[in-house]
């Protein structure tokens, strides 16, 4: 079986999201914007473009058009001084903005941002490897550029603001755990740093809820020597839907005592356009010798219909695993309606039922045939090695399997059907008898808008109090309320 005709759209990895927005709803009611008085400062006016600009669409298009924000102007700063000046000006005139790096930031709550200024940060596109083996990363860098630079130096990094899951988290923890400091622009243009030594309270909050406080301009990350000389064993296995129960049983066996810290498992469910049946691709990556990785592949290969094995460089994993189909998921423009949750186990009976229902749904709704389901089963040793209160990331004990459904379509006639189907199945997967957890836990970068905020940021009252305090301190007027906003009062958590 070659490249398959199955994935018309695949989920994005959402691996380096730095989104910040302004939706000062209460503030704008008190101090409404007066467009007749808006005249950009001369220092930045040449960097601001309206819809008549030929490149306006290119510079404002986002990965998903589902409940997306809209823009009247785009601002492309070249220096942090220009960014600072513009923020001071926009906040003073109560203008609404959204900051964009890669444009993969997904949250239906961004729909509240309409007729705004898009701050396109593509000019902050640099990676600098330091003598101490840290990487200084501009916020405009795409993750592919980052990993190429780091890998060329014989180093590696976990695959920030929402946490940062990745295949190497068993060895190195989350991407946000590798963060050492950031430079941040606040709502009024003030530029500050945050680290364990400077603004440590803000640094704590950035690592798990960072879209709420400002615009990250630059980040400094720790890197590590490349594992196994930079080579990773990868196996792509293809299964028909009648193998789903066995696939889940084996995966549960692998995770029961703790998944090998060097092993990562990804699964994709999608409709084969030729057979009109669900096909499942399982990708195994072992960050070690081929012979050790193959021991895990042999658990699955006897009942797979196709197997492809490779030794890949770390920098090749995002583009050459899963038959090289993942880059196609970065296509911009379609509606991508996501539902997600974390589970302790993968209940075989529930997944068999889902697979049958998913196939029936896609056949009945061909306009949504590009939809997919993804499961990321990554090791958690590095994640759990840090204390629960190490950062604002709340799921260190609830991160065995991260499930993400991606409803993909371009015709809104199927919007309600897609939304209802995946919301219903998210709730079924979240039932304790299926998930193995007593509550709903959701990785923030994959969240929709119908989950309780505690599912994203943690159920502990001390977390609510600490996050709300940070919100009031660093974003007192709610200019960064577009992306799963932290409440400005503790009562808002309920």
Label the model's feature ranges.
Residues 2-3, 13, 18-494:
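Soluble FAD-dependent oxygen oxidases
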